[in-house]
Amino acid sequence: MGKSKKIVMTGGGTAGHVTPNIALMPALQQAGYEITYIGSYNGMEKELIEAQNIPYIGISSGKLRRYFDWKNFSDPFKVLKGYGQAISLLKKIKPDVVFSKGGFVSVPVVLAAKHCHIPAIIHESDITPGLANRIAIRGAKKVCCNFPETMKYLPSDKAILTGSPIRRELFSGDADAAVRYCGFPDRNKPVLLIVGGSSGSKAINDAVRKVLPELLENFYIIHLCGKGNLDEHLKGLIGYAQFEYASAELTDMFALADMAISRAGANAICELLALHKPNILIPLSAAASRGDQILNAKSFEKQGFSYVLEEEQLTEQTLLSAVDEVFNNRDIYVKAMAESGQMDSIGTIVKLIESQTK
């Protein structure tokens, strides 16, 4: 009997740094890997990973910011503490390989892997690498990426175009189950799914709610509005179902949805592409981010997969006309997505992990 293979996975902070790891887990287990997950003590990744029955270990983590904040003085010490904890854990677990999906908790784990001479592979979802991955690249053997445009920002001897791992269960949702869960009276109208990212989006929530009467004339609406963003006044409105967040139910909601309005996080838009869902992307503004969502959205718009509405242009009128435009031309968007020739991301990444396993 061969030696058992071990992998440590890391990544957290937002759902986009966790769900691709979850997508890889069944294939890694099938390939014979024993998985341990290292995340932050109380990050959202803890709940998501423990729901998969994967051993989870929390370490100290801090955020590296590009702006002034008093926490900038204390957080480097948290990161250093996390680095020490990660070294101890890796020496104890003795994994063959480390796989990181990014986010600040991943930096000490990847750098600890280099210190312990354990090969580390990281995955960058966005067109330009985020700060955490830019630091972690130094400790990585290979860097997987989502977009062809990203290759030029990465060391040529490390960069590999893999696409984004998509959870297989997303393709097997039950539309009728979503009708029941959302309390819709029937399936006589097309369904518009609105997703503001794992923490929600005030700009999208406000714009959608202002035009609800007009939207509800033609659509049933599923609105994932983020934690603490439910509107009590809209409870019981026929054809409008609002939820803070969806986990297991999301696959059914995707199956029911005819089109989507979404932020432009790389993982979210890759799921829309894989499912061939016509969509309107409203990327986080450059003022509120490093601009990665704007680049992601423009790449998808250029390829004919998405309609982009920048947050600065988001009004009641522009939103309604965008919905009309995309819904009336939905077949064109679906055709472009169906012809995109997507990669077998999970298979490619698992092979890469196996190539680095001692």
Label the predicted regions.
Residues 331-343:
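A short, well-ordered alpha-helix in the C-terminal region of glycosyltransferases
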Residues 85-98, 106-121, 134-139:
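Glycosyltransferases and closely related glycan-assembly transferases
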Residues 342-358:
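C-terminal alpha-helical cap of glycosyltransferases
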Residues 4-12, 29-78, 87, 310-312:
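Conserved nucleotide-sugar phosphate-binding/catalytic loop shared by glycosyltransferases and other
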Residues 43, 48-52, 175-180, 184-260, ...:
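Donor-nucleotide binding loops and adjacent catalytic segments primarily
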Residues 95-97, 243, 255-270, 277-278:
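Acidic donor-binding loop of glycosyltransferase active sites
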Residues 6, 34, 44, 55, ...:
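Active-site-proximal region of nucleotide-activated glycan assembly enzymes
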